[in-house]
């Protein structure tokens, strides 16, 4: 049986315009397809990934235009619905960003910082991204 891995995603929006997704969320989806077992905790600026309906404008450099902007909320929904990967958001990181629970995609669970040690115990590996 594969080891269960807890993935805490904190560094947000790196390479998302170039890649059209978050590299870690993409990697977790691919690994889940190969049989790995993951749980995701979004913290810091990465809590914004779970905001429903968010988007990013396209990027133009000279005459080149990036027309496939990332849709991070769709990536989170893919993890939840298609990949069956549990996704948590640290509730203490919502308020400083002006976010509320009702702004998040359905299925994302709130977690307090105080609950982190208990979720650590449920996983063989903990990675901070």
For each feature predicted by the language model, list its residue ranges.
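Anion (oxyanion) recognition and catalysis
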Residues: 32, 81, 120-121
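Short amphipathic alpha-helical segments and helix-helix/interface helices
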Residues: 25-29, 74-78, 116-117
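Short, basic, glycine/proline-bearing loop/turn elements
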Residues: 9-14, 58-65, 99-102
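N-terminal glycine-rich phosphate/adenylate-binding segment common to multiple enzyme folds
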Residues: 87-129
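Short internal beta-strands
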Residues: 37-44, 87-91
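Short, glycine-rich nucleotide/cofactor-binding loops
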Residues: 6-22, 44, 48-50, 68
């Amino acid at each position: 049986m594969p080891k269960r891995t807890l993935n805490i995603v904190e560094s947000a929006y790196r390479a998302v315009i170039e890649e059209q997704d978050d590299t870690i969320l993409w990697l977790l989806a691919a690994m889940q397809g190969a049989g790995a077992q993951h749980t995701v905790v979004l913290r810091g600026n990465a809590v914004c990934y779970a905001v429903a309906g968010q988007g990013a404008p396209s990027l133009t450099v000279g005459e080149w235009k990036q027309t496939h902007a990332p849709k991070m909320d769709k990536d989170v929904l893919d993890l939840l619905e298609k990949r069956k990967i549990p996704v948590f958001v640290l509730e203490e990181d919502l308020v400083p960003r002006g976010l509320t629970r009702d702004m998040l995609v359905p299925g994302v669970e709130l977690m307090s910082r105080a609950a982190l040690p208990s979720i650590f115990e449920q996983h063989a590996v903990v990675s901070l991204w």
